[in-house]
UniProtKB/Swiss-Prot annotation:
Assembly mode: NDH-1 is composed of 14 different subunits. Subunits NuoB, C, D, E, F, and G constitute the peripheral sector of the complex.
HAMAP family: NDH1_NuoC
EC numbers on record: 7.1.1.-
Role of this protein: NDH-1 shuttles electrons from NADH, via FMN and iron-sulfur (Fe-S) centers, to quinones in the respiratory chain. The immediate electron acceptor for the enzyme in this species is believed to be ubiquinone. Couples the redox reaction to proton translocation (for every two electrons transferred, four hydrogen ions are translocated across the cytoplasmic membrane), and thus conserves the redox energy in a proton gradient.
Source organism of the structure: Albidiferax ferrireducens (strain ATCC BAA-621 / DSM 15236 / T118)
Family: Belongs to the complex I 30 kDa subunit family.
An MF annotation (GO) of this entry: quinone binding
UniProt protein name: NADH-quinone oxidoreductase subunit C
Keyword annotations from UniProtKB, A to Z: Cell inner membrane, Cell membrane, Membrane, NAD, Quinone, Translocase, Transport, Ubiquinone
Matches recorded under InterPro entries: NADH_DH_suC, NADH_quin_OxRdtase_su_C/D-like, NADH_UbQ_OxRdtase_30kDa_su, NADH_UbQ_OxRdtase_CS
Catalytic activity: a quinone + NADH + 5 H(+)(in) = a quinol + NAD(+) + 4 H(+)(out)
Domain of life: Bacteria
Lineage: Bacteria, Pseudomonadati, Pseudomonadota, Betaproteobacteria, Burkholderiales
Amino acid sequence: MTSYAVNPQSIKVHVEAALGDLLISSVLRLDELTVVVDGAHYLQAAKILRDDPNCRFEQLMDLCGVDYSTYKDQPQTGLRYCVVSHLLSVSLNQRVRLKVFAPDDNLPVVQSLCDVWSSANWFEREAFDLFGIVFEGHADLRRILTDYGFVGHPFRKDFPVSGHVEMRYDAELKRVVYQPVTIEPREITPRIIREDNYGGLH
């Protein structure tokens, strides 16, 4: 059985008290606390989680985007894009997951956390690049994983697996060129081996 330096239920009580009315929901599942705040109060909530003496989440460990358009194979019922941050308190040995949903699915915008935790910089650039989530107040919001000529955001669930364009080296032009994707769309079905014990491999 896992023993915790701080009881997860105590973390929930402290975080709920610190955030107060800024909190939309707070769920403790598998001894991990997830809190959801409104986009209008995202930056304020982050500062409270960093500065409150019972929270003291000094470090942002990770930040990513999520596309909920087909979550659990169900049609979308709420907002589509979410930003999820994982925060760590080194001094109190506790963690929390902070979630905020972008209020507009057509142009997802949330506030940048770079002024609260500088480690958010490249994480936010990655979420912008892969999901198209715009971080308001980010000083250098540009692509970080795809090239600067890339069209679209490849982690969105409506982005085609094959992409839109491909690159190849053109010997005549002596440079890399873009061209429309040349592979045909296809449905990929996993191979199933029906022999007993996988053909005697086990």
